[in-house]
């Protein structure tokens, strides 16, 4: 099996059209093979070590979380993903544990929140992105608390969201 066939096999196994440089190395291939795929237009580089098949449906929520594995969608982005807001956020909000530092985070179109490591996992759930891929997000209760605790929150929006959530549960 040649390098191209191995890459194709890895992409087929991934189901989402993504592949990492680490997977290529584990398969016994040199990472330069990925650059050949990028040059030919069959793939593009989404971030450091993360490559996506050009024909794959691009899911920003999923790809950003693959790129920043410690990030959890929170605040207004979580409200949107949980179905309690009809406004697509202009910038996605992700929460990271304090001490996590990825220099490229500042270059993304993200609002970055930090939390002490003891509270980082609290309220974390896994849901499907709008494109059907698994993503991590904070649950509704954690999201509402985070929004209320933050500065400049719109109390009417949060109250409306909370009431709407309880109406759907009843």
Predicted features by range, described:
Residues 29-36:
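Short amphipathic alpha-helical interaction segments
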Residues 41:
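Glycine-centered, phosphate/nucleic-acid-interacting loop/turn motifs that mediate DNA/RNA or nucleotide
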Residues 162-170:
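Single conserved hydrophobic/aromatic residue that forms the stacking wall/gate
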């Amino acid at each position: 099996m040649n390098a191209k066939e191995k890459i194709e096999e890895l992409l087929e196994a991934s189901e989402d059209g993504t592949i990492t440089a680490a997977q290529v190395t584990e398969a016994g291939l040199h990472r330069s093979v990925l650059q050949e795929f990028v040059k030919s237009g069959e793939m593009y580089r989404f971030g450091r070590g993360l490559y996506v098949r050009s024909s794959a449906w691009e899911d920003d929520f999923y790809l950003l979380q693959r790129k920043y594995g410690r990030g959890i969608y929170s605040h207004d982005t979580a409200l949107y993903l949980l179905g309690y807001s009809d406004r697509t956020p202009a910038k996605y909000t992700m929460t990271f544990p304090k001490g996590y530092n990825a220099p490229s985070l500042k270059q993304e179109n993200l609002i970055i929140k930090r939390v002490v490591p003891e509270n980082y996992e609290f309220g974390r759930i896994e849901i499907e992105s709008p494109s059907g891929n698994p993503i991590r997000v904070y649950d509704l209760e954690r999201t509402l608390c985070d929004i209320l605790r933050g500065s400049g929150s719109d109390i009417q929006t949060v109250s409306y969201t909370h009431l709407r959530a309880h109406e759907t549960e009843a």
